[in-house]
């Protein structure tokens, strides 16, 4: 853990639709030492998606005698080697005096070579390109810029959070007159936006957002929170989202029973993309411009906010031992991402329901979606959940056209396992203990140093007063089917086809591209398509002599006879090929969960789980002024 700079409550904003260039400045603490590494970031080339960085590294910030700088290859929370150094160019030593220079020494490293005094600070300059709009990559434009620390800030190698926790960092934004929002500590008395971080972990874990943005504050749990709006807000209901985000925050705080941060920021990028990434005291989320106008999308946005905010406890503080301090130059693996992401994925929809922001029907629809996804993924029979977690770096974040058959998502199956674990604990304890109980105790017990996989399992067994090892082995370490039927009976839930007519229709067993739905992206193992030899990359031209429209084969397949054999014409490698397909019904038709109302109903258990049914708040009228 790094020691954070003291924050002044005087810098907390009141709710407002407009910002000054630097919204608040912390007052210097007499005990605070000046940061030793200084970055000056110039944003004059944002129109070309570039930032210019100059950095000064004191001699004392290096490890040993070698003067080597490195850039992370990944960012925490997103388990994929992204090789951010491919976006860095023009790295040069500014004070070599002609006797020394920077030499590329690894894909993400630069080393000072030549005659360079060991007591001299290292001053470098480089350019960073950013034009990929995701929550884990840099994106620079005049209208909106998102700076990701891992993709931007070179630091003395080797890059590990524990080695650099005693080093302070200062970031100066030169020439930036736009509003700026970040979890980094502002520095008072500077002519340009300037921020400090106590350690490299904090620097990397604090995205910087600037451009056309607005900040809106609310209180929850006696702590200030800020909803930052960025992007096209003309169709976005600020009043509704601010009110409901506050309710989500309060519900999650009540779940954990304590608040571990001083101020929390929700950076809401309204950009028609989707995604979220957790940080210690903030999150970056992306959503549709019209999400507040569409009920399903809005509930999804609330669940996304809940998911990332839940991570402020589960992942950022309660974590598997491997997930901190970080090694930023190589993969960090753990079998416990099912806890980090799967458990969080279970609670994101559930806590939105408990907050009264969704109905029981909407929640059961969301849980149905998790079950349908799992049961329509043949990979569940191939890859155990703990292995899916260990392989996150090469599987989930790098899917292939056969991933549906060989892989499983630790988000998806992890959420289902969390639901089943909650069920097991409630059943064993006769409702006196729940997964909520386990998570709160795990937070108290393991936040300081992290937990091992067997420690989390043992804690769950202890709290439930029942040996759960058999459940864990089946659900996590094998590919056996999960005990879903028993959970349905316990909760008094029906699991019926969403549409009996559709469930009885012919089934092909392939997935097509999002743009041109005639292009085959993947083929489900054992399906009629697979048995007939259809393959990823095929272009579907005709089925039973009828041309396949750009919307895909579904409009034809639904009229075909189950058990019938039909010709399917495809284009493969530039040649026409005909396959003979025998159509069946789907082995896992879309189903929906509904609470029983007669025999087998469990209304008391449902209420203890989902909370009392309530009318969701109406959408507030009015949007933020552009």
What does each of the following model-derived ranges do?
Residues 1-6:
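N-terminal secretory signal peptides that target proteins for export/translocation
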Residues 8-21:
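Bacterial N-terminal signal peptides
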Residues 27-74:
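Early extracytoplasmic/domain-onset interaction patches
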Residues 36-38, 50-54, 66-68, 121-123, ...:
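Intrinsic-disorder/low-complexity, polar/charged segments enriched in Ser/Thr/Lys/Arg/Asp/Glu/Gln
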Residues 44, 56, 76, 81-90, ...:
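Non-catalytic architectural context of zinc metalloproteases
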Residues 91, 252, 339-351:
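An active-site-proximal "capping" alpha-helix that borders the catalytic cofactor pocket
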Residues 214-337, 343:
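Juxtacatalytic substrate-recognition/specificity segment
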Residues 348, 358-626:
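C-terminal recognition in membrane/secretory proteostasis and scaffolding
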